[in-house]
Amino acid sequence: MTSSESTATDSPRKGLTAALESSQPRRRSFTDYRRFIQNHYDGLPGALTAVTGLLTGHEALAGRLIRPGAFDVRGCKRILDAACGNGRYSRFLLRHADADAILTTFDLSPRMLTRARARLKSERVSHAVADLTRLPYADASFDAIVCGWVLEHLPDPRLGLRELARVLQPGGKLLLLSTEDTLTGAMCSRLWHCRTYNRVELRQISAECGLRWEREMWFSGMHRLLKLGGIIVEMRRASLPDSHSA
């Protein structure tokens, strides 16, 4: 299966949430869709992520996920912020990581990387334009990874999860955030032209890719109660994924 033409293999969506979801991922080939998404984030929608993050509370809530007692990166020396966007999670990684830790970031959108550089202004960070399905890093390069709100831009999550598992060292930790197949998730899908994932199915697929769910996390107790905020989970790399698995 190639990243350019692969299609989703999970269960078909039904009902109101399916009707509300963006049709862009289904209407376009992956090559065309990837170009569309890059242009989307290079443009005004990407520039507005700083504003929308404030309005939705995601800017402040990000700090509740990346900190001691939550996704703790103390002791991690090589950290990757996958599809870093405007640097929302990078700034908390820098705040809580050891002083000698190195942060690597990438994004498909060159303009988002420019915004992240302007925001972070740190010599401890390196930036690169890269594709989650073809990461330019060696096996087991990182002991911690944050991957926020990018997996839903792939037709099949395995394309990204296998690469994340490959570059994560055995026992390394991954914080994954992804849009869920709920009503609010479908509304976000329409806004950002992405798909959604079912929580149970994504857990099973993660295991196929060598990633073991450790714990599900939430922005707040209210998010947990109302099942809001999407899928947020801390995982560990168990072993090398089988490239021939389904």
Specify the residue positions occupied by each region the protein language model found.
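Conserved beta-strand signature within the Rossmann-like core of class I S-adenosyl-L-methionine
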Residues: 172-178
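Acceptor-substrate binding/catalytic loop of class I
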Residues: 186-201
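Class I SAM-dependent methyltransferase SAM/SAH-binding core
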Residues: 80-82, 86-134
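A short glycine-rich, Lys/Arg-flanked "PGG" loop and its adjoining helix->strand segment in the class I
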Residues: 158-170
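Conserved S-adenosyl-L-methionine
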Residues: 211-222
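A conserved beta-strand element that flanks and buttresses the S-adenosyl-L-methionine
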Residues: 146
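Short catalytic micro-motifs in class I SAM-dependent methyltransferases
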Residues: 149-150
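Conserved class I S-adenosyl-L-methionine
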Residues: 5-72, 88, 92, 112-115
